[in-house]
C-alpha cells in the first residue's frame, strides 16, 4: 500500500536505515547511492571492542587528545585513559596540547599534501571527531558559525587548515561566506576551488563573499 511504501522510504532513512543500524548493509565507499552487504558479524567482548575502536580512532583521527577521545566515545576521561594506556600511541605537541596518534604499519614519515581549500560536508568527521572547543581546525571565535545551539553543524570552508567560513547550495547556487574579510585574490582562490570541486554539479552560479557589512 502507499502507507507501507512511505514507511519503507522516508526522510529518516526508512528500511535502509533500519538495515544499516542492525548491521546488515553499509554504504559503498565514495558512492553514497550504492549499498553492500556487511561482512558476517563476529561478536567480541566489550573490552576488546573498546580497544579495537580506540585503535581505529587514533589511527585515522590522530593526533587527538585524551579529551577528544573522551568526547568522541562519550566515556569519562579516566576510563578512556585506561584504554589508551594499552595502545602503542605516539605522543605529539599540537597547539600547546599533548595529543596522540597511532601510525599505520609502514606509514611514511612525510604526510601527503592536502589542498589549501576544502569544502567540508555538514556534520563532517573533521569536526565531529574532536572536542569542538579545542578542535585544532576550528578557531574558537568561529565555533558558533558552524555549531548552532540547536544541534546543526553547517558545511564548513577550510582554508589553509582552519575553518574560515561556511557554504551551502540552494536552487543550484553555491554560496560560500567567509567569517572574516579577505582580499579579492583570496576570494578568487576560493571561487576557483569551488569550480574545481563542483564544476560538474550543474550549478547555475557560484558566489564567494565576505561577511555582510564588513
Task: Tell where the protein language model's regions lie, with residue ranges.
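Long, charged, low-complexity, helical-prone intrinsically disordered regions
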Residues: 1-214
Amino acid at each position: 500500500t502507499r502507507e507501507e511504501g512511505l514507511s519503507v522510504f522516508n526522510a529518516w532513512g526508512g528500511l535502509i536505515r533500519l538495515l544499516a543500524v542492525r548491521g546488515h548493509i553499509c554504504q559503498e565507499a565514495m558512492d553514497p547511492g550504492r549499498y553492500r552487504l556487511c561482512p558476517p558479524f563476529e561478536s567480541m567482548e566489550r573490552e576488546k571492542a573498546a580497544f579495537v575502536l580506540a585503535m581505529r580512532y587514533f589511527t585515522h583521527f590522530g593526533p587527538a587528545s585524551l579529551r577528544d577521545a573522551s568526547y568522541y566515545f562519550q566515556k569519562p576521561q579516566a576510563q578512556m585513559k585506561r584504554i589508551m594506556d594499552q595502545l602503542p600511541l605516539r605522543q605529539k605537541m599540537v597547539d600547546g596540547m599533548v595529543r596522540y596518534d597511532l601510525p599505520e604499519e609502514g606509514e611514511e614519515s612525510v604526510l601527503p599534501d592536502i589542498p589549501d581549500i576544502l569544502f567540508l560536508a555538514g556534520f563532517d568527521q573533521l569536526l565531529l571527531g574532536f572536542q569542538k572547543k579545542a578542535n585544532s581546525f576550528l578557531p574558537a571565535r568561529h565555533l558558533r558559525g558552524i555549531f548552532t545551539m540547536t544541534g546543526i553543524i553547517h558545511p564548513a570552508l577550510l582554508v589553509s587548515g582552519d575553518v574560515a567560513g561556511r557554504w551551502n547550495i540552494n536552487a543550484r547556487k553555491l554560496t560560500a561566506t567567509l567569517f572574516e574579510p579577505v582580499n579579492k585574490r583570496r576570494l578568487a582562490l576560493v571561487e576557483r576551488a569551488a569550480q574545481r570541486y563542483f564544476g560538474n554539479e550543474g550549478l547555475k552560479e557560484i558566489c564567494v563573499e565576505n561577511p555582510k557589512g564588513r
